[in-house]
Amino acid sequence: MLFSLGNTLGDYSTLLRDILGGIAFVLYLPLLTAFVKSFKNYRLALKNLLTASIFPTLLMQGMLMIVYQDVFPEWYGFTEGIFRTIWWLSFIALISYIVIFSKRFLWNFELSNVFPSWAVLYIGIGISSLTVPWTGYSQLGKTIFIYLLLALIVLLPTIFLRLWKHGIPDDVKSNLATLCAPALVAVAYLNAFETIYRPLLLGLIILSQMLYLTVLYFAPGILKSLFNPGFSALTFLLIVTAIALKGAVNYFEGLYFLYVIELVLAILILIRVVAGYINYFTD
């Protein structure tokens, strides 16, 4: 999620944007290389329901790279072509993955198999709408947004029903962070449409903020627990929620102070998670 955070902070510092983008590439490329080299091992790991539902974040990062297509203006034609190709490959792979996951886990549906991270899986495709300002695929972004609304209506009640009936194990409580996924729907709406219907935007913002507060309630306990790669879900959704507020400020100016607070919190938690990743891989 460093790609998105770097782009957001680019409004305040171009240098900071480039630094975060560079760190994101340094972290992303080895991860992608490891996935390709150890595909068989990862394929076995993806048979785990929880791991499988979080995996799409790797593809979402591939789509987010396109926000850095202008990092070298003198090579724009080349970098734009590279990043657009990566965007399409990630987009197609994400749709294919959703189909495969659905066939595997929805065919014989069990409520106990549903985790909050299903929101990332099925709503994560909203990255295609978020990146419309860079891709120019406005019609695709609008179509995806309609899907996101429908997915949100089906997913949230299902997820909360699962949590109410079955709870969630302590060792995977970091998965609760993915409850912030509706914020991505708000960002998708803001980026894909020229005309914004304020009541709809306000409804999405209120919903995302309610879930954000829920995640913050559990965040201290999550961060105190033993680090695992699932912590990335925490940073991803907290940053998206802050980005949603940033866009909403153009329509509801009173949200600016709240946006700054959430951005700072997202940065602090990101630092904690990056440190955890460094220790995780060095050990």
Task: Please report, for each region that a protein language model flagged, where it lies by residue.
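C-terminal transmembrane-bundle signature of multipass membrane proteins
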Residues: 3-8, 25-35, 159-162, 184-283
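Helix-coil boundary and interhelical linker segments in multi-pass alpha-helical membrane proteins
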Residues: 7-17, 68-82, 130-142, 189-200, ...
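Membrane helical hairpin/interfacial module
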Residues: 12-77, 84
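Structural signature of hydrophobic alpha-helical transmembrane segments
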Residues: 16-29, 79-95, 139-153, 198-210, ...
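Short loop/beta submotifs within extracellular cysteine-rich repeat domains
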Residues: 37, 72, 102-106, 152-153, ...
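Membrane-embedded alpha-helical core segments of multi-pass
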Residues: 90-103, 123-127, 152-155
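Loop-centered beta-sheet repeat module
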Residues: 114, 118-164
